[in-house]
Amino acid sequence: MSLLKMEYNLYTELKKMTCGQSLSLFNEDGDFVEVEPGSSFKFLIPKGFYSSPSVKTSLVFETLTTTDNKITSINPTNAPKLYPIQCKVVSEVVSNMRKMIELKRPLYITLHLACGFGKTITTCYLMAIHGRKTVICVPNKMLIHQWKTQVEAVGLEHKISIDGVSILLKELKTQSPDVLIVVSRHLTNDAFCKYINKHYDLFILDESHTYNLMNNTAVTRFLAYYPPMMCYFLTATPRPSNRIYCNSIINIAKLSDLKKTIYVVDSFFEPYSTDNIRHMIKRLDGASNKYHIYTEKLLSVDEPRNQLILNTLVEEFKSGTINRILVITKLREHMVLFYKRLLNLFGPEVVFIGDAQNRRTPDMVKSIKELNRFIFVSTLFYSGTGLDIPSLDSLFICSAVINNMQIEQLLGRVCRETALLDRRVYVFPNTSIKEIKYMIGNFVQRIISLSVDKLGFKQESYRKHQESDPTSACTTSSREERVLNRIFNSQNR
């Protein structure tokens, strides 16, 4: 730990990384406070900040030669086989770490790699190279299985802890596994933090973007007060301010053969309203809608739009155009609505729900990976980041209010490299609730723009359903309605 006075140059360097947000650190009294320019207090500067050689410092940091937390059970023949692009990442990491050791810099690296790159297998390869006892920290239980599979493939002795940190600490008195796989809430326990700081050299923070380290969280406190000897942050969408805790970044572009298309399912709706909708509309401009809660609630009860989503999905699934579908909503009640309706159509052998309130959901996710055809309905919170179903070929985004980081993570669920190359995303920019039509159009346009401009998707209009089903709510049977549709869409965007 390094307690330093906040001099001008240090403050400027740290503040630059927050991209205009407030800069918060632990002060000498242990309080997590916002740092003001010219402050006379001393602050705890994160170890990982000094991993970049561009940061000037006279501090000298320990290297691995001073510890003895080595893995003794490594068999080099068990190291996973990597693609050439993954080997390039490994080469970059090894080269950077040699320089860090030479310069006495902390061995902290952020692996900023695209969704579907194979961050888990690449990091397991690095873990085998380092040969150091490792803690893998994940934000939720759902991500544990993919790490377990890769760690077992490398042949390392490991322990998974999901039943509570107190039970784990008791077990660690009689055993010392080479790899610990834990959920991040374990870091709220100081005794556990002290233990891994002493007995484990490598700390891997998976999905690091899910943690805002400018907040006083368990991960923030751990990295500040119990900094590991080596650390990897893994993410496809890094938070700029998190660089303060891990200031060396490796980012290698990934070329893909995937054919990625985002289908814009336009429709012209007659205005739709109910007593419930009218009641929620009154709350749109109030403080209760600060995070667009009521905007999403209105979408969840927009019956014509919901029916359009269902009609599109059913037609595409029945035709065999898509086979392994992820349906994403923002709200749980919206998820349950789609699940029940799809369950009535296709049955429990095909339709599954990714419910955060069901403890069996992670086991269910494992079971559907081998299915040739399925529909998985879940929420953005549960399945928007880290969902490990590589075979997904299509995504239906029923929500609208999603930030850029969430959009990129969500689209990454259908960008995993497999033998099948076609990937389809369906978005629905229209609503029958006139009070939110422009807002929804703008939010969905942001999804479209990011997918095309940054992630390499091709945009196409989806017309099949409207032309083939004259009885649906989204029928455009006349030339006049098609003209109105085009006018409406141009206004929406």
UniProtKB/Swiss-Prot annotation:
<dbReference type="InterPro" id="IPR027417">
    <property type="entry name" value="P-loop_NTPase"/>
</dbReference>
<feature type="short sequence motif" description="DESH box">
    <location>
        <begin position="206"/>
        <end position="209"/>
    </location>
</feature>
<dbReference type="Pfam" id="PF04851">
    <property type="entry name" value="ResIII"/>
</dbReference>
<keyword id="KW-0547">Nucleotide-binding</keyword>
<keyword id="KW-0946">Virion</keyword>
<keyword id="KW-0804">Transcription</keyword>
<dbReference type="GO" id="GO:0044423">
    <property type="term" value="C:virion component"/>
</dbReference>
<feature type="binding site">
    <location>
        <begin position="113"/>
        <end position="120"/>
    </location>
    <ligand>
        <name>ATP</name>
    </ligand>
</feature>
<keyword id="KW-0378">Hydrolase</keyword>
<comment type="subunit">
    <text>Interacts with G2. Might be part of a transcription complex composed at least of G2, A18, and H5.</text>
</comment>
<dbReference type="InterPro" id="IPR006935">
    <property type="entry name" value="Helicase/UvrB_N"/>
</dbReference>
<dbReference type="GO" id="GO:0004386">
    <property type="term" value="F:helicase activity"/>
</dbReference>
<comment type="similarity">
    <text>Belongs to the helicase family. Poxviruses subfamily.</text>
</comment>
<dbReference type="InterPro" id="IPR050742">
    <property type="entry name" value="Helicase_Restrict-Modif_Enz"/>
</dbReference>
<feature type="domain" description="Helicase ATP-binding">
    <location>
        <begin position="100"/>
        <end position="256"/>
    </location>
</feature>
<dbReference type="GO" id="GO:0005524">
    <property type="term" value="F:ATP binding"/>
</dbReference>
<keyword id="KW-0426">Late protein</keyword>
<dbReference type="GO" id="GO:0003677">
    <property type="term" value="F:DNA binding"/>
</dbReference>
<keyword id="KW-0347">Helicase</keyword>
<protein>
    <recommendedName>
        <fullName>Transcript termination protein A18</fullName>
        <ecNumber>3.6.4.-</ecNumber>
    </recommendedName>
</protein>
<comment type="function">
    <text>DNA helicase which seems to act as a postreplicative transcription termination factor. Involved in ATP-dependent release of nascent RNA. Forms a stable complex with single-stranded DNA, and to a lesser extent RNA.</text>
</comment>
<dbReference type="GO" id="GO:0016787">
    <property type="term" value="F:hydrolase activity"/>
</dbReference>
<dbReference type="InterPro" id="IPR014001">
    <property type="entry name" value="Helicase_ATP-bd"/>
</dbReference>
<keyword id="KW-0238">DNA-binding</keyword>
<keyword id="KW-0067">ATP-binding</keyword>
